[in-house]
Amino acid sequence: MAHKDPREPFTRLSPTEVRRMMENGGVQVIDVREDWEYQNGHVPGAEHIPVNTVSARRNELSRDRDIIFVCSVGQRSALACEMAAAAGLTRLYNVEGGTEAWIKEGHAVEK
């Protein structure tokens, strides 16, 4: 279930909540893992912006859509949310448990 910690500039979502948001449209999904991790399987439609490039590539982040960050377990994506917030973005979400939880819940990945 969605969880917003007032100390964090993002909302934590379960993989199922993310899938629902994606089905409704109007979201940008960003996978912040390394190239080899992304190539081994990622959330369908996710754009690839490695966490160490998020600040430099902030102009690629949507200012008019919800942005969902995902990594392997949710730590690097939380850092990416922090970077996006520092760039002035506010509609930020982190996939709780990352791609591992996405797969564990039975959602498909693409390669």
Q: Model-derived features: where do they sit?
A:
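Rhodanese-like catalytic fold shared by cysteine-dependent sulfurtransferases
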Residues: 1-28, 35-66, 75-111
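Short, surface-exposed ligand- or partner-binding patches at beta-edge/loop junctions that are enriched
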Residues: 70
